[in-house]
Amino acid sequence: MMQTCCIHQSFCFPHRVFPRFDASIGIKPPKLCQVGFIGKTQSYGISSPIRQRRLYVNLNANDGHPSMSMLEEETSTENNAPSQEAELPFSKWSPSKYIWRGLSVPIIAGQVVLRILKGKIHWRNTLQQLERTGPKSLGVCLLTSTFVGMAFTIQFVREFTRLGLNRSIGGVLALAFSRELSPVITSIVVAGRMGSAFAAELGTMQVSEQTDTLRVLGADPIDYLITPRVIASCLALPFLTLMCFTVGMASSALLSDAVYGISINIIMDSAHRALRPWDIVSAMIKSQVFGAIISVISCSWGVTTTGGAKGVGESTTSAVVMSLVGIFIADFVLSSFFFQGAGDSLKNCV
């Protein structure tokens, strides 16, 4: 047995040659080589790939010449580039997805406001989105408001009749619907129906590079995709809220009359005495704010989607959840700002 070596630049890899008719040779280069550079005091480590080859050598019986064949080869996925031994702190840290998505919300909202002020509105897309958000969402909103109104009526009538406050039931229902229930319930329904649609549509366009195609064609995605959805949501939510308030009060009055024997006239008269114009105006303002929150968050989550079909699903779910959280936070802030101090709306209903 004799030993040879193959010299390649400054590296030596030993090989062994076996004078046999059938031989299996395993070649394993070194895993780590230390290289010193003249004039440099800093050392670098070069990781060479680990290669395992199985060679079969067969001698021809006729002429004695060897024939060699390679059966398999396995290569590690280690990084071959020179790397410093001492890494800088936080060199591999990247911000969370929620951080840069949260930062994209005020940026996109500001761009939408600038487009509206400059008059850069794509009216055809705006009307299409307004039809989707308004009339096509009306049935679900009215159905939800009907059953929520009847559920609250059962609780209020059951307790107020024991106290002899039948004439206050309509006022309490009217205040609850106008100030809280109608705007919040309508926004929740729209967030589940349209917010998810916005995030899924824009997310699919983002991962399929359709937004890049719009930029190549000279169309701004903010003008063409996002601004129409924001305008449609802000315009449709107040009208949906008003319709939900009307249907909710009607269902409550019908249930009170049919089940508990409280006349519809008593419910309507009590509601008329308790309600004030500011209650309806505050509901409209709340619904507009909620519509802006739903559309901006859903569009922001959509245009920042990555990861293909899985990323689209995650963005859609996350957009709806964050929209609901934003609705509840905004509802608390607006309610604490609109209705401060002690109220006297029910004093005329007793």
From Swiss-Prot:
InterPro entries on file: ABC_MlaE_roteobac (IPR003453), Permease_MalE (IPR030802)
GO function term, MF aspect, one: lipid transporter activity
Location of the region described as Disordered in the Swiss-Prot/TrEMBL record: 67-86
Keyword DNA-binding on entry: no
Tissue: High levels in green tissues, but low levels in nongreen tissues such as roots.
A biological-process GO annotation: lipid transport
Compartments, as annotated in UniProt: Plastid, Chloroplast inner membrane
Chloroplast intermembrane compartment residues: 158-168, 251-288, 340-350
Pfam families: MlaE
Keyword annotations from UniProtKB, A to Z: Chloroplast, Lipid transport, Membrane, Plastid, Plastid inner membrane, Transit peptide, Transmembrane, Transmembrane helix, Transport
Superkingdom assignment: Eukaryota
TM region positions: 98-117, 137-157, 169-189, 230-250, 289-309, 319-339
Assembly description: Permease subunit of the TGD complex, a lipid translocator at the inner chloroplast envelope membrane made of TGD1, TGD2 and TGD3. Interacts with TGD2 and TGD3 with an overall subunit stoichiometry of 2 TGD1, 2 TGD3 and 8 to 12 TGD2. Interacts with TGD5.
Function: Required during embryogenesis. Permease involved in lipid transfer from the endoplasmic reticulum (ER) to plastids, and necessary for thylakoids formation.
Protein name in UniProt: Protein TRIGALACTOSYLDIACYLGLYCEROL 1, chloroplastic
The species this protein was found in: Arabidopsis thaliana
Gene responsible for this protein: TGD1
